[in-house]
Amino acid sequence: MNKEPMSMHGYNKICAELKQLKEVERPNIVKEIDIARGHGDLKENAEYHAAKEKQRFIEARIVDLSEIVANAQVIDPSVLAHNKVSFGSTIKILNLDNDKEFSYTIVGSVESDPAKGLISFGSPIAKSLIGKSKGDAVSIQLPNGESDFEILDIYYKEICFDEN
């Protein structure tokens, strides 16, 4: 698997979820399964089957998160030069087709939240912008077709990951 770029915030968030799953959720589901097992015939025991399904989900999530942590590439965007678009850059772009301005910050996939302007490093928009400079024109493939943009500004600002 390729390295997964992320900020320290994203890394800590994944590690906290992994710890919660291993230390709290996993032991709790084992108890739930034991209790359900005590309710008789396992073939017709909906509580048992639901608990086993939940256990499969928890174990799969642990595997996924463990892989992400193992492949994490923690990047401090505050120390990068943002003269070209890179991880952690905030980019102001102008859609040349409709004169609308957009602002995006490039973050790791585990941190992305497009509604808040936080786009994944691996997203089509970010891939089109990475390495470009202020003033560059860029064609970006969007769901409704290709659009042309101009990069108006590239800068670093502290990324707001508010969890609300």
Curated annotation (Swiss-Prot):
Gene3D superfamilies: Transcription elongation factor, GreA/GreB, C-terminal domain, Transcription elongation factor, GreA/GreB, N-terminal domain. SUPFAM superfamilies: FKBP-like, GreA transcript cleavage protein, N-terminal domain. Pfam families: GreA_GreB, GreA_GreB_N. One of its GO terms (molecular function) is RNA polymerase binding. GO terms for biological process: DNA-templated transcription elongation; regulation of DNA-templated transcription elongation. Keywords: DNA-binding, Transcription, Transcription regulation. PANTHER family: TRANSCRIPTION ELONGATION FACTOR GREA. Necessary for efficient RNA polymerase transcription elongation past template-encoded arresting sites. The arresting sites in DNA have the property of trapping a certain fraction of elongating RNA polymerases that pass through, resulting in locked ternary complexes. Cleavage of the nascent transcript by cleavage factors such as GreA or GreB allows the resumption of elongation from the new 3'terminus. GreA releases sequences of 2 to 3 nucleotides. Belongs to the GreA/GreB family. NCBIfam families: greA, PRK00226.1-2, PRK00226.1-4, PRK00226.1-5. This is Transcription elongation factor GreA. The lineage of its organism: Bacteria, Pseudomonadati, Campylobacterota, Epsilonproteobacteria, Campylobacterales. The gene is greA.
